[in-house]
Amino acid sequence: ESQLQLSLLLSSTGMYTESIDVLESVDRQKVVSRLIADYYTCFDHVYGELSVYTQDKTLSGHYWTISQAYKDSLYAILPPESEEYLMMREALLRDQHQYEEALKVNDLRLAETEVNTPQYALATYHRSLIYKYSNDNLGEKQNLCLSAISDIRSAIKDHASLWMLAQLLYEDGDMERAYQYMRFSWNATKFYNARLRSWQSADVLSLIDKTYQAMIEKQNDRLQQNLLLITALLVLLIVALGYIYRQMKKLADARN
């Protein structure tokens, strides 16, 4: 059981080779029946991740085929009402663009979770993906917010929801919040040492950071210009007051 948990942890942090090595060290014949689903899930997860993130398109198809084979095995043994089954069902419906049906399945998952738990964070993150692919920007943001809050309150250091939310805010021009969220997410990623998340968020962080720094420089330039303008106006005011004082003094002397 500990080896399966280790494998899932390794694949979740982008250490795919290490994850597969751990799985291949497990003797399938010695896996007890209650852990068979976990065993298949680990294989499905690592090969599913590889199919998405490998740079080799040929290997991507190969990894996807392996992942689907383990999914089929999971469908055959998982209870239809289980969280694992519902999560797979939701992903399948989402990939088939059946977004309304996918939301209904997600509703079932949310009904079994509590706010500010890892399970709630995962369910709302998956819900944000449904809204993303159905082009509902507001729904995507709302669920990323809910997911990010639950991640933080659950002390989860892998902030996928937060950096995705930061990217959306950046695209909307909300640079201040995008920068703060991305920085917070990046610091957590470094603490967690998540290789995959670091790779995913590095480009976004760099882009947001450069844009934010450019915005700060522009604001500083504008502030400097305003200070120069205020200084010039202040000098003119002093000169004007001096001129008025001299004129009033001349007028007073003339009257005397």
Regions found by a protein language model. Name each.
Residues 213-256:
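Alpha-helical transmembrane signal-anchor helices
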Residues 1-221:
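A "functional boundary" signal
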